[in-house]
Amino acid sequence: MKTQIPVFTEVKEKEICADESGAYNFLLEGDNLHSLYLLEKTHKGAVDVIYIDLPYNRGKTDFIYDDDFVVTEDGFRQSKWLSFMKSRLILARQLLSDKGLIFISIDDYEIATLKMLCDEIFDPSNFINIFVW
């Protein structure tokens, strides 16, 4: 990836269209950080809803994706997770429209830490609620 610049490539077979109105939606596959940087160039301030299912930072490997982001015994585990999340949430904030919403899935293990990070990035006055499901 050091020598390659990520680019959007449209795949017509994967086009998402609800009806014939011409409304266009798309699915972006790729590394989330690189994808967010690309979206910032094309969709800054234009996204109404973002849903993120984060790594829960539990060190588990029984999820569909690898949640063992940082070695469990690492003394800087939470700090590394916060740095990982902060860069992505800052980019997500840049994508949101003025009335945009972000929904974030997390478990009880990191919810307090995530809430403080979101307050820093999105401003506490923008917080609406926690949905437990």
Language model feature labels by segment:
Residues 51, 131-132:
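Residues embedded in well-ordered beta-strands within globular domains across many folds
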Residues 34, 56, 110:
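Short, glycine/acidic-enriched loop or turn micro-motifs at the edges of active sites
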Residues 1-51, 59-78, 87:
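DnaQ-like (DEDDh/DEDDy) 3′-5′ exonuclease domain used for proofreading
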